[in-house]
């Protein structure tokens, strides 16, 4: 089964499937799954010496305002393999804009059936303060050395804003 056949989730927006493109703490390489072939491509080598503070991926069958599927960060006890799919629930969203427009990053934790470690996290403010700071710092800085690219972080949104981002992106993709 190709990645294009992975559903958006079991019960949107609270129970989603995230296709992982970049493992947490990996080398500074931006990977993207080609939505037509399902292949994992190297998008670019990041100019900054930074790594993603959580696993990074997307929800299939969604379309964010930047024209890509909704982006999701997933903290886990261990880095996940690119191309793997993880069942999650959203807890918040980092609101930001870049040179291509709105570029929100949903933060989601693994579903309770995978691990009980995140059961106490109901909202982004329940995440460790250091992890939130690392995520924000990463996205404020990761394009700093790339000519013509920029990012403006506008702050954090709660679980309800994350849920709405997922629903809006799912509806946008159906049009």
From Swiss-Prot:
Its cofactor is Mg(2+). Belongs to the PPase family. It is an enzyme of class 3 (hydrolase). Homohexamer. Pfam families: Pyrophosphatase. CDD domains: pyrophosphatase. This is Inorganic pyrophosphatase. Disulfide bonds: none annotated. Mg(2+) 2 binds at residue 71. Mg(2+) 1 binds at residues 66, 71, 103. Its main location: cytoplasm. Keywords: Cytoplasm, Hydrolase, Magnesium, Metal-binding. Its EC number is 3.6.1.1. InterPro entries: Pyrophosphatase, Pyrophosphatase_sf. It comes from the Bacteria. One of its GO terms (biological process) is phosphate-containing compound metabolic process.
């Amino acid at each position: 089964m190709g990645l294009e056949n992975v559903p958006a989730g079991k019960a949107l927006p609270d129970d989603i499937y995230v296709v992982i493109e970049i493992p947490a703490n990996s080398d500074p390489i931006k990977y993207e799954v080609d939505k037509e072939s399902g292949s994992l491509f190297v998008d670019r080598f990041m100019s900054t010496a930074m790594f993603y503070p959580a696993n990074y991926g997307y929800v299939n069958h969604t379309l964010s305002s930047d024209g890509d599927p909704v982006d999701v960060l997933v903290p886990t006890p261990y880095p996940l393999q690119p191309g793997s799919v993880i069942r999650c629930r959203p807890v918040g969203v980092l609101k930001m804009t870049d040179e291509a427009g709105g570029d929100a990053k949903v933060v989601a934790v693994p579903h309770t059936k995978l691990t009980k470690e995140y059961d106490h996290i109901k909202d982004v403010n329940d995440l460790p303060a250091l992890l939130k700071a690392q995520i924000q710092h990463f996205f404020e800085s990761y394009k700093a050395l790339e000519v013509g690219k920029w990012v403006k972080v506008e702050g954090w949104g709660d679980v309800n804003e994350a849920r709405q981002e997922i629903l809006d992106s799912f509806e946008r993709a159906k049009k």
